[in-house]
Amino acid sequence: MTQTINTNEVAYKKPQWLRKKLTPHTQVEMENLLKDVGGLHTICQEAKCPNISECFSNKNATFLILGNICTRRCTYCNVTTGMPKKVDESEIKKVTTSVLTLGLKFVVITSPARDDLIDGGAEQFYKVTKDIIEKSPDTKVEILIPDFKGNDESLKRVIESGATII
């Protein structure tokens, strides 16, 4: 049995909004700058996000605060699971320095789940966000927070940070 191919079919081009320019040099450049200011982690790198080049080329970055080790094991995420290190207070300055150095206008701050901390990391979210807003007032800050184990006080503290989007 032979199969015939209809050669009259029209080949459609992908719409412009679906096309993605891959700019690996921009990605490498931003990763090197992040290393230069203290080896910060981005969720883009840790979770092996397929859109990393797109975000970096648009001068957007999602910073992973509170380390790169999660206390939970979610099947959809590639972030390492284990016992995290203590909170790094110098991270606040490092994130803000990166925002200023890279000229970022939109920043997302997220973290792995930190069930080992009483507030789930809410105070660090507050401090990082406040510092960015204070030193780079034109930068919009979105925070993607963990569930803080349902702790209402932790959520209230994060809201007080003044983030543009929670």
Segments predicted by a language model, with ranges:
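Flexible, acidic/Gly-rich N-terminal and inter-domain linker regions that tether
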Residues: M1-R72
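Conserved Radical SAM active-site core
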Residues: N58-I166
